[in-house]
Amino acid sequence: MKEEVLGLPIEKIQEKIKEYDFSPRISNIGYVKSVGDGVAQVSLLNAAFVGEIVIFESGIQGMVLSLKEDSVGVILFGRDEYVKEGEVVYSTGKILQVPTGSGFLGRVIDPLGNPIDGGGLIFPEAYVPVDNEAPSIFDREPVKEPLYTGIRAIDALIPIGHGQRELILGDRQTGKTTIAIDTIISQRNYGTICIYVAIAQKRTNIARIVQTLREYGALSNTIVIATFPDDPPALRYIAPMAGCAMGEYFMRQGERVLIVYDDLTKHANTYREVALLLRRVPGREAYPGDIFYLHSHLLERAAKLSRKLGGGALTALPIAETLAGEISTYIPTNLISITDGQIYLDTALFNAGVRPAINVGLSVSRVGGSAQPKGMRQVAGRLRLDLAQYREYAMFLEFGTELDMATKKKIERGRRIEELLKQGAHEVQSVEEQIITFYLANGGFLDNYPVEKVKDVVIKYIAYLKLKYSSVLTLLREQLELSDQIIYQIHNIFQEFEREVYANPSNPQA
């Protein structure tokens, strides 16, 4: 039996020695001047550049984030208690790269790609730079392909398209994350790859979100990138960029990708913390001067690529938190100006029991109807008009004004539409079911039913269609248009449905 050293035969070791290059190497090294709060000041790293990865003698990695005449500021990807003053720091000349690939789907990882769900090792398909240039104008296509959230109020009134950036903002505990999670759940039927980036979120919240995605069958096409409040600032800082880099990998393979940043307010606070520790000059609200660039550079990477580049798309849903409903503060206004629209969640509506608590008046999608199928455009235009008229006329009711029959009818129609826009958490609805729902509302089919019963009527009618006339739903799903044939069938089937389910349509309470 041949003698072995370090698990290798002697012959193999001798071959390795012959292959080894013993010529001198020039390496740039420095020494730790000070360390604390996840940041180290390193001297003598004269050739360092911003974004460069350095390795400490203790094995901790860091990234250069500021340059001074006599030192460089490094943020640490590990605990700073393992780094000591005077410790040697080695320059690598490389930028940060993260692993990515289909093996990460269904897993919970940290921003560096390390699994934190106890599920074993992940074998990456590639390593991609965290910081990439956004696709140029010539590499993009207009946003036209709809991304269905499964939420009626959004798909009808604030449509989102693949490649768009739509901000979700509102006060704490108003349902921002719920909208994002429902959108991810809705993508399980459309083959969209989803990435959920949790920035400084509680472990209990992450566990609940992962469990929800698993229960609704959406975890298998989702990567969860999680950072916690007690993580080093460096991990919280790079989390959205790492998630974006992973999403870009799939986008360039022609895939449709949805990424959620939850939330960029916490990310801005992390960057402010890091910048102050690095002694950068503070600006408005003590944020560093390049905070706008940081977020715009991140969100500009979302795109719908041209066909010559594979036609993939990366859609971004950044989340921002407001304070006392004030959307004119620094970070929210920055993000509103960067994105292609916003969904504003109103605390007053939330407290009144409206779910989702979307303030339609302050919400907008700058892509608009171009990201809606024809069938949805057919019903959404009338829907907006009826809803706007209802809110205008409803003001007169507060003063006890007597109204004519036509106005009263519009108010009653508006009440039913408003009721149909309410939707519970995780109750996502397919686009064909939404089109039928709003067609019934616009067409007056629900006018004879009490407001509190209209949702129940629609649910029963769609169940009736699935049971007896599934071909109508299939045809609408394929055409995504309310053709004369489909409209004729909807009318006839609804009359039949009323006869069978409600013996006396004129007295539906019976």
From Swiss-Prot:
Membrane topology label: Peripheral membrane protein
Subcellular location: Cell inner membrane
The keyword Translocase appears for this protein: yes
Keyword Phosphoprotein: no
Gene3D superfamilies, A to Z: 2.40.30.20, ATP synthase alpha/beta chain, C-terminal domain, P-loop containing nucleotide triphosphate hydrolases
Binding site for ATP: G170, D171, R172, Q173, T174, G175, K176, T177
Superkingdom of origin organism: Bacteria
Top EC class, one word: translocase
GO molecular function: ADP binding; ATP binding; proton-transporting ATP synthase activity, rotational mechanism
EC code: 7.1.2.2
Site (Required for activity): S363
Major location category of this protein: membrane
GO cellular component assignments: plasma membrane; proton-transporting ATP synthase complex
Keywords of this entry: ATP synthesis, ATP-binding, Cell inner membrane, Cell membrane, CF(1), Hydrogen ion transport, Ion transport, Membrane, Nucleotide-binding, Translocase, Transport
Pfam family, one: ATP-synt_ab
Reactions it catalyzes: ATP + H2O + 4 H(+)(in) = ADP + phosphate + 5 H(+)(out)
UniProt similarity note: Belongs to the ATPase alpha/beta chains family.
Entry function: Produces ATP from ADP in the presence of a proton gradient across the membrane. The alpha chain is a regulatory subunit.
NCBIfam families xref list: atpA, PRK13343.1
Record PANTHER family: ATP SYNTHASE SUBUNIT ALPHA, MITOCHONDRIAL (PTHR48082:SF2)
SUBUNIT field: F-type ATPases have 2 components, CF(1) - the catalytic core - and CF(0) - the membrane proton channel. CF(1) has five subunits: alpha(3), beta(3), gamma(1), delta(1), epsilon(1). CF(0) has three main subunits: a(1), b(2) and c(9-12). The alpha and beta chains form an alternating ring which encloses part of the gamma chain. CF(1) is attached to CF(0) by a central stalk formed by the gamma and epsilon chains, while a peripheral stalk is formed by the delta and b chains.
Protein name: ATP synthase subunit alpha
Species this protein is from: Dictyoglomus thermophilum (strain ATCC 35947 / DSM 3960 / H-6-12)
Gene of this entry: atpA
